[in-house]
């Protein structure tokens, strides 16, 4: 009897060890190194990038929003300039303080915090209209998107994580469950999200919580989530700054996020051994059929702020060098 019991115990231990080893292997993500193929700092003798706020790639065209220039630049995939979209000025059609951009069916939407509105432009760069929201209702600078004339934007309101605004008829609804941090200030500042569109679903990515969530846009219910707190790049900062996060503040761990095909790309943010800012690794996540960490993409620079992706090519804004780089696998 004791022998049988011993065999059962050994079998259970072996199974648990095997499961543990399998989980450990899953955590060992392959690192893929990228190199710089080309870059752009500006165009001509007077137009230089300095405060890039967003990057988008759509139908072989790259869109760059720059807050200092108060314009959106449209280029081809090799940085050849096609046109400038919008202009700085005091008028209702002019830019004041541009942030994130989004594209839907050849329409470009630019969120301007000066107007507290999403301004719409057609494929020729002509102004088509805008939809205004109060500043204290929304979070910027975070990614937003438009789907079937509905605007999806991260909200500071208690009713949900993000707003769905039907711009045709003006109706609104709140979606997503906010995390409760126990106090009003962290509840307000730590529930911001990057929002990305994927197959009639909304992907939410926090810049201070290591979690990705997917919401169905019809049911407004969360259908999947993924915790990535085990990634070495951010793990040490999460542990080191545990006390700081308790003091009505938060630790930034994500600089940007982008969807291309069936993959989500999360640009991680951390600190080096000497306390220097690092943002040069991307966590690549498979979206369907379930969320799954795939690999780590190592970028050649040290501090990138924004990214967009076209298949295996990455466009990244190098904050230190004030330029947009085209990066490819080594």
Regions found by a protein language model. Give the residues of each.
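Blade-level signature of beta-propeller repeat domains, shared across WD40, Kelch, NHL, RCC1
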Residues: 306-330
